[in-house]
Structure formats: C-alpha cells, structure tokens
C-alpha cells in the first residue's frame, strides 16, 4: 500500500471543483471591496519566519548551498515582508490571497499540516473603521458560500496583554496561562493564581475572563468591574461594534474577552469565526500594528484568514455543499462533420456550458445520463 503523510490529503475532481468554487467566491468578494490578489513564494529562508514561529512548527529543509529554507507557515508574515521591502505608494493598501500554508500541527486534534487559507490584509490605517471593515468582509465572504449559523467572536489582545505585563511572568508561564484561557479551564486557572500568588485585582480579572463571552452586554459587564487597564479597550470595541451594527452585521457578532490568539503578532482587536456543529475556528484575524516594523517599515495593519477546508466541511455538514454547476453537453458527430461539430461545441462553451465531443462510434461506451443535453451533428 502507498500512503500519504499525516496531515495532507488528495482532492478528487468533484471535491476539488467544490473547493475551487469556494475560493473563487472569496476572490470575488475580496475584489468587490477593493483588495488586489498577491501570491508570495511557497518557501523562503527560515529566518524570515523564525521570530514568529517555533522551529518545530515549521517544515524546514536545506538547499544545495546549505541555506535553511522553510515552507510558509503563514501568509500574513510574507505580505508584511513584501510591503516593507517592495511596495511603495499610497496607503491604505489592500491585498488579498488564496494560498496553501504548511505547519507541523498535531493531527490528533483534527488539524491539517497543509491547508488553504483565503485572507486579506488592510495596511496603513489604524482606525476602528478599518477593523470593522475587515470583520464585515469576513462575514460577507462566508455568506457568499451559502454558509449559515456562524458567528464572529470579537476580543482584544490587550485584555490578556495588560494582565501579563502586570504579573511579570516568564515566557513559559505566559504560554501556560494563554493555553488555560484558550481552554477556558477555570479550575486550572485557579490553581495557577494560587501557585503564582497573583494579587487580588489581576486574580479577579483572570477568574472572570473565561466567563466573559456573549452579546454586547459583556462589554458593560467588564466596564462595571472598573479595571483601568481595559477601559480604553472596551471603548474601542464598543465603537467597532456600533459600526458593525450600522453595516447590518449585529446578528453575526458576539464577544469573547477571554480570547487569546496562538500567533503572537496581534496587538489590538482579534476575532474568530465559528459555525454551529464544528468545533474549530473557520476564520481568525485581528490587528497587528508591530509586525511590519520587523521587516523595516513601521505601518499599522489588520486582516484575517479563512480556512477553506473547514468551510468545505461546514457546508457539507449543513448540506449546503451544492453550487450551480454548469450544464454538461455532449456533442456527437460524424467524422466528416468534425469542423461543424467543433464550431457548435465552441458556441455552447461560450454560453457557459461544459462540452465534450465524441464521434458516434466512440459514444458507445459513454454514459449519456451524465450529460444534461446531447447534441447531434450530421445525424
């Protein structure tokens, strides 16, 4: 038997057509918002990613000159490099992409190691309307596929960041706390508080964070706690929410103030998309105002990435995986009518049909039921 490595998959014709259809819908929506598509290389020097990703999470290899290369684990970092080193012009700059990403993930928890992301980056503006735009765009993109019952959970990196700065924790403890909050593991968080002897105000906030998810009332709930570090954050989230309300997006929005992102380059608003019946995020995004500075240009930015495969799975589970397929037409012809048959086939193709041509003799083994129409030329 010949097997594939863990975390990769083949896409057979119908499955791949379904996938491409979703990707094309995303491209159409991105383009309608003024975003231009870009395609970075599949691999780069490993050091281009080393400040963002652990070596063990990347697929790294040597070239013949001894350079250490890596398959891209993230497209946002690549776009930050491109904008910082190759793109000059007026801002804001709107870029989008559909590209495969490679990460050495734990496949036991349902993650792939090669997967496709469709995303956008809005660079050069730090206004709340920019954050609202990319969140609204993520919603419009997901809606374009026919997906139902999804929500965008919104949080802010500074809720967690302000706590960590006050606690003066080491990197290992910060990562542990991040993981506990991600899991909303209240008992383990309580043990962490006691073990680290965290002072009363921060301890109270840590206990609250796993519970701070829901509608706009969550913002009011945290405001009443009077944590100084979160005052500006809550005001900002409230302004973004009001913009999204004006956009007619209220039904798709909820808040999760205990949200933390695995990628450490987020500096402001963060968000994730979830769909009913699927335990994984189908979309992740947020503001990353310090990332471009690493590559030499100090510009604010915000964006998101949608997992195409997870959207496929969600659509299949919702039985929304069908799309309007083009009509399939069979053109049968006599050999002496080949020229006329080809001209007829091209007319049908220009009308949006998928057309196959066979002589009458070759049609003996063709499944005529697989075609929506059969056109005979010369019979």
Swiss-Prot record:
Sample GO molecular function, one term: transferase activity
Location relative to the cell: Cytoplasm
SUPFAM superfamilies (UniProt xref): Class II aaRS and biotin synthetases
GO CC, any one term: cytoplasm
Nuclease among keywords: no
Keywords recorded for this protein, A-Z: Amino-acid biosynthesis, Cytoplasm, Histidine biosynthesis
Biological process (GO), any one: L-histidine biosynthetic process
Main location: cytoplasm
Pfam families found in the cross-reference section: tRNA-synt_His (PF13393)
Pathway named in the protein's UniProt entry: Amino-acid biosynthesis; L-histidine biosynthesis; L-histidine from 5-phospho-alpha-D-ribose 1-diphosphate: step 1/9
Note: This function is generally fulfilled by the C-terminal part of HisG, which is missing in some bacteria such as this one.
Binding partners and assembly: Heteromultimer composed of HisG and HisZ subunits.
Recorded family membership: Belongs to the class-II aminoacyl-tRNA synthetase family. HisZ subfamily.
Main function: Required for the first step of histidine biosynthesis. May allow the feedback regulation of ATP phosphoribosyltransferase activity by histidine.
Name of the protein: ATP phosphoribosyltransferase regulatory subunit
Organism of provenance: Caldanaerobacter subterraneus subsp. tengcongensis (strain DSM 15242 / JCM 11007 / NBRC 100824 / MB4)
